[in-house]
A protein has these predicted regions:
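Alpha-helical transmembrane segments in inner-membrane proteins
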Residues: 1-344
Length: 344
């Protein structure tokens, strides 16, 4: 009972941090709007609640800044952080590798190649209000998932190592193709690199809804199957001896998580270390039960990336840093410490 209270307390603290972080993120920017004002303006956009919030003291421009610029960006950063963090936690169990992250199967490389083609060749396509780069990135990511499964994961007895090696090989191939394309189109290299380093500057409500729906479905599947992750973490032979169809569950989880990563990367670019760092911190706080780790990773990942994005758009204002740079600054030292601890 005491442990349950402790875990509940940690969840409440994490949720409170997420809320406070969101309020601060909404209030920070070139236009000065206080925290209370930002919260009021954000609440005014919620159907059924907005009519009870007095925002008469705020200008039309301030309402637009909060509701159409900052709020979609804050929510999108939180959603992508939650998705990448949960994906990293699942992959670390599936591949029995504490250094596994959401990009381990080459999904991000596929998305990056799709985005590169869209940028360099001026492809014009839009689906449900999502622009060319996002659509092409998502298509590239989905095609990568299909390739990985066709080559390394379709057979019933396919081993994890086969899927992993296939993903690594495809990722290397796509990276080489990207390098070739960029070497032939020098004038647009900067735009490609900026996308690859991650940014939420193009956040709009359509992207928020799209990612939210994808994540809701995928995370529900992951949470339902989280009890099997606990058994798989003990080793494949142990799980099989307990009657768990590890191959089937692994295939489902890899597919679902990869689709979630594809949705995240298509709207944000390639952002590293979120799915590597946060699951380990959450595991330290909540133990090794993945029924507790996944909700914690969702909250922790959302908070971490939201704060990193806030720093990215304010540290060098009116300019903006790629958010992937900040996540790498935080994540790389942690990765070094993790490797050092494993070697010891």
């Amino acid at each position: 009972m005491e442990k349950k209270k402790t875990y509940l307390y940690i969840y409440v603290c994490m949720a409170a941090l997420l809320f406070v972080g969101a309020a601060i993120s909404l209030s920070v920017g070139s236009a000065e709007i206080g925290i209370i004002g930002s919260i009021k303006l954000a609440l005014s956009g919620i159907p059924g609640i907005g009519q009870f919030v007095d925002i008469s003291a705020y200008s039309t421009m301030q309402r637009y800044i909060i509701l159409q610029v900052r709020l979609p960006r804050v929510l999108l950063a939180a959603l992508v952080g939650a998705g990448l963090s949960a994906a990293g936690g699942v992959f670390q169990v599936i591949f029995q590798n504490p250094l596994a992250d959401p990009h381990i199967l080459g999904v991000s490389s596929g998305a990056a190649l799709g985005a590169t083609i869209a940028i360099l060749f001026g492809v014009q396509v839009s689906v449900l209000g999502i622009g060319t780069i996002g659509v092409c990135a998502f298509i590239g990511a989905i095609l990568t998932i299909m390739l990985v499964y066709l080559i390394g994961g379709m057979k019933k007895g396919a081993k994890t190592i086969g899927i992993l090696l296939t993903g690594t090989a495809i990722s290397t191939l796509f990276s080489a193709v990207m390098s070739l394309l960029m070497s032939l189109n020098h004038d647009k290299i900067e735009q490609v690199y900026l996308w690859m380093m991650g940014s939420f500057s193009a956040a709009v409500w359509v992207k928020v809804c799209y990612v939210a729906i994808c994540e809701m479905v995928c995370l529900c599947v992951c949470i339902v199957l989280s009890k099997y992750l606990n058994l798989m973490a003990m080793g494949e032979e142990t799980a099989q001896s307990l009657g768990i169809e590890t191959a089937r569950i692994r295939r489902i989880l890899i597919l679902v998580v990869s689709v979630m990563v594809a949705a995240c990367v298509s709207v944000s670019g390639v952002i590293g270390f979120v799915g590597l760092v946060i699951p380990h911190i959450v595991r330290f706080l909540l133990g090794d039960d993945y029924r507790r780790i996944l909700p914690g990773a969702i909250l922790g990942g959302g908070f971490f990336l939201m704060i990193c994005d806030t720093l990215a758009r304010t540290v060098t204002a009116p300019g903006e840093l790629p958010v992937g740079v900040l996540t790498a600054i935080v994540g790389a030292p942690y990765l070094i410490l993790l490797i050092k601890r494993k070697l010891a």
